[in-house]
Amino acid sequence: MMARRDPTSWAKRLVRAQTLQKQRRAPVGPRAPPPDEEDPRLKCKNCGAFGHTARSTRCPMKCWKAALVPATLGKKEGKENLKPWKPRVEANPGPLNKDKGEKEERPRQQDPQRKALLHMFSGKPPEKPLPNGKGSTEPSDYLRVASGPMPVHTTSKRPRVDPVLADGSATEMSDRGSVLASLSPLRKASLSSSSSLGPKERQTGAAADMPQPAVRHQGREPLLVVKPTHSRPEGGCREVPQAASKTHGLLQAARPQAQDKRPAVTSQPCPPAATHSLGLGSNLSFGPGAKRPAQAPIQACLNFPKKPRLGPFQIPESAIQGGELGAPENLQPPPAATELGPSTSPQMGRRTPAQVPSVDRQPPHSRPCLPTAQACTMSHHPAASHDGAQPLRVLFRRLENGRWSSSLLAAPSFHSPEKPGAFLAQSPHVSEKSEAPCVRVPPSVLYEDLQVSSSSEDSDSDLE
């Protein structure tokens, strides 16, 4: 009996049973909401609203009767944005009202400043406020005042200058500026230092004897023109002030009124021996190979280019213009090696610009022919042999090229004369033009020449 059953009928029965089970289980599951109810999880694709789908009858795109019409807000009379909002109460002003109040206060604060400026430039008296407290200042008032040409009165604001000092100070500053323009940096420094010091503190004896107008009106002329006994060579020169004693003696005759304005400042009177020998017979001049001394006072000439340096103790071509002859000389060592006592002259004890002899760039026209080397013996300087130190013996030779060479020789020590008057009797004056084979030259002249050459080398080494 079991074999006779049809398999197809068996399959149909299973399908029917499964469908019946599904129908029975359906009420147990979640029910779909009716089409009229809103579901926030749904979104319409047509109108973009939530709660219904595109097929729902609630969509306004399908049912135009239920669509909302935009309501009009009403029209205002007049133009739009004429009064966009009502002003708030002043008791509680907003941020916009605060900004307006600050803008109104700023021009009120600037009004006194404008009045002060107008009074300063126009010179008109300030306006008095009205008794009711309301000022008559309008924006048009400022425009009226500024539009026309305003007179500027600067006489009241300009600092008053003493009429006595007005002429001299202006001329002095202009002339001094023109003099400074033609000087080298080293000379400008010396000029500024000497001008800053008072008349009693200046240590340049040569510049102290000159009156103040000499700096103003000489221009490119030499600051100190000292006339020796014979004729002075003409042409452009580079002058350096000589010793204080010589300048003082010559300037008294040339410029008697200079002493009233500016007296000479010297620590001690110069010894009569050096004064006599330097003031009457000597006219020292350096040749083209000479060096400019490091401690030179005010100079108002042009700065010439440097020449090649010579030996440490070498004297230039025209070291002794009066004698023109070489002479071994007994000299005292430099002041650093000896003690400086009361008997030492200021030229030996103090290295001031007054120790430097004058410099002449132009050699004399007529000069006798000299042998290669000549020598003579000279007595020792009384002021230099203060402590009895061993003196130096220097031999000066005249070279073929017109220059001088020096060499140190050992010399026995001897006692110098006690009085300066004895030195005057032993050392005659230097003649103008030498004709004898040997001429005695005062030792102070050669000592100053050596000191100038050594100081110039020290200054060049410091600059390099």
UniProtKB/Swiss-Prot annotation:
Instruction: Give the compositionally biased regions (Low complexity).
Output: 180-197
Composition-biased stretches, type Basic and acidic residues, lie in 74-89, 97-114
Chain residue ranges for the region called Disordered: 16-42, 70-389, 415-437
Q: Which family does it belong to?
A: Belongs to the FAM90 family.
Query: Further remark, if any?
Result: Primate-specific FAM90A gene family, thought to have arisen during multiple duplication and rearrangement events.
What name goes with this protein? Protein FAM90A5
